[in-house]
């Protein structure tokens, strides 16, 4: 049975450590660290993932690579007196995922664009790298597109800040349904945050 190019790319990215040569991966990470934190790119690194999430090679669709620090929340030190163990600085887990933080930072940098979706492309000891698909709702080619035209409506403005992307829905627990998900809908707040 003949397999498509997308299938081959997807198989490669299932185990990137085994599939991508180590020297090439090290050079790529070094280059990405030198790039700006939010860096516009010509085409996606993972074509299969980008296409699966709605990417099209057309005007009005913008690709951005960004990096976010790995690990738990970084909190500034408190000058008021207290036991070091009670400062609440270490081992604090964010309520948002790192992927969601990346999407929001990119959206703040591009206020005229809407975040469609994002996917992981790599990580090193300090950073995680994501590629984010942005859409220009005012572009005629997007307004006339059958698959992407929905994003031009006013009700989708600022969708990333309201947890409407895939990463946002996962953080709100909306990827779960059935038994155990009773306190997630209509929202966590409506259930007094007893759902997470």
Model-identified regions with their sequence ranges:
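An N-terminal amphipathic alpha-helical segment
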Residues: 58-75
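Low-complexity, rRNA-contacting terminal tracts
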Residues: 1-59, 81-196
């Amino acid at each position: 049975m003949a397999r498509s190019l997308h299938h081959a790319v997807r198989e490669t990215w299932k185990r990137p450590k085994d599939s991508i040569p180590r020297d090439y991966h090290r050079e790529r990470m070094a280059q990405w660290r030198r790039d700006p934190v939010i860096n516009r790119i010509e085409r996606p690194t993972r074509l299969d993932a980008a296409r699966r999430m709605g990417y099209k090679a057309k005007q009005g669709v913008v690709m951005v690579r960004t990096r976010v620090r790995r690990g738990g929340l970084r909190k500034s030190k408190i000058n008021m007196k207290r036991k070091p163990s009670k400062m609440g600085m270490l081992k604090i887990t964010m309520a948002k995922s790192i992927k969601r933080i990346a999407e929001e930072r990119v959206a703040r940098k591009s206020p005229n664009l809407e975040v469609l979706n994002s996917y992981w492309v790599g990580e090193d000891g300090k950073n995680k790298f994501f590629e984010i698909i942005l859409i220009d709702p005012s572009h005629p080619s997007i307004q006339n597109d059958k698959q992407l035209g929905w994003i031009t409506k006013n009700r989708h403005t600022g969708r990333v800040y309201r947890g409407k992307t895939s990463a946002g829905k996962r953080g709100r627990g909306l990827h779960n349904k059935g038994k155990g998900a009773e306190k997630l809908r209509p929202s966590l707040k409506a259930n007094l945050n007893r759902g997470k």
